[in-house]
Amino acid sequence: MSTGGDRLPEAFLRPGSSSFVEFLREVAPQSHPEHARPAGAGDVVHATTIVALSFAGGIVMAGDRRATMGSFIAHREIEKVFPGDEYSAIGIAGTAGIGVELVRLFQLELEHFEKIEGAMLSLEGKANRLTTLLRGNLGLALQGLAAVPLFGGYDLDRAAGRIFSYDVTGGRYEERNHHSIGSGGMFARGSLKKLWRPGLGDRDAIAVALAALVDAADDDSATGGPDALRGIFPVVATVTAEGYRRIAEGELAGLVAEIDAARAQAREGDTR
C-alpha cells in the first residue's frame, strides 16, 4: 500500500531484513522463482559442464558454452559462469532458465546485504545465502527442473581461494583443490585429478581448466569444447585478492592452441 502521493510503498520505507529474498517474498511473491510455473522437463534448455580449481592466488572457474534440449544443441554460446560479487564466482548446471534466475537473485542478495549492512558478507556467508536460495527452489527441483551451482571465491579472511559444491536440496560441501559439475563433470574431474598440482600459477590453472573441458567434450555430447572456427571459447574467470576477472578470448585462444599442439605432438610420439 502506498503512503500517499508519489511516495514508495510502505514496505520500501520501513526497516527490514538484510535479505533481498525475504523482501521479494513480501513485496512481489509472484516474482520469486519458487512460484514459477513448471514446464515439461523435455521442453527446457539444460546447461552442462562447469569446472573450478584453486591455484596459488585464488580460484579459476570455467564453463563450456553449449546448452542442450533433449538430444538437440539448443545454444552454442550460452554463458554459465558469472560474478557473484567482486570476490566470488558462480557457475550453473542443469535447467538453464532456473539457473540464470538463481544467479541474478543471488547477485541481488549480496548487493542488498552490502547496502543494508554497510559491509560485505564473508565468503562463508555468501555460500550459506546460496544454500537458502537453493532450498527455495526445491519444489521445482523435485519436478525435474533443477539447477545446481558451483560457487567459489577469494576468502579475504583466510587469504586463499575456496570452492563450494551443492546438491539440489541446498546441501553445501566445501571442495579441496578442484571440482566439476554437470553432464561432463565426471570426465572433467578425471582430467583435473591428473593435471592439478599444488602451487599452480594463474596461467597454468587456466590451462588446466581448459584441458578439463576439452576432455569432457571428448566424451560427453552435451559439453561443447573450444570452437576456434566459430570463435567460441569457454567462459573462464579468476577470483583473486584483486577481485573477479574474466579472461579475454584472445588469451584463451592462445592457450587452446597450445593444448591442441601438445596433444597432437603426443599422438605423433605414440608408437603403439
From Swiss-Prot:
Active site: T48 (nucleophile)
Activity control summary: The formation of the proteasomal ATPase ARC-20S proteasome complex, likely via the docking of the C-termini of ARC into the intersubunit pockets in the alpha-rings, may trigger opening of the gate for substrate entry. Interconversion between the open-gate and close-gate conformations leads to a dynamic regulation of the 20S proteasome proteolysis activity.
Propeptide: 1-47
One Pfam family linked to the record: Proteasome
Subcellular location as annotated: Cytoplasm
Single GO molecular function: threonine-type endopeptidase activity
GO CC, alphabetical: cytoplasm; proteasome core complex, beta-subunit complex
Catalytic reaction list: Cleavage of peptide bonds with very broad specificity
Main location as per UniProt: cytoplasm
Biological role stated in the UniProt entry: Component of the proteasome core, a large protease complex with broad specificity involved in protein degradation.
Subunit-structure text: The 20S proteasome core is composed of 14 alpha and 14 beta subunits that assemble into four stacked heptameric rings, resulting in a barrel-shaped structure. The two inner rings, each composed of seven catalytic beta subunits, are sandwiched by two outer rings, each composed of seven alpha subunits. The catalytic chamber with the active sites is on the inside of the barrel. Has a gated structure, the ends of the cylinder being occluded by the N-termini of the alpha-subunits. Is capped by the proteasome-associated ATPase, ARC.
Protein's UniProt name: Proteasome subunit beta
Native organism: Beutenbergia cavernae (strain ATCC BAA-8 / DSM 12333 / CCUG 43141 / JCM 11478 / NBRC 16432 / NCIMB 13614 / HKI 0122)
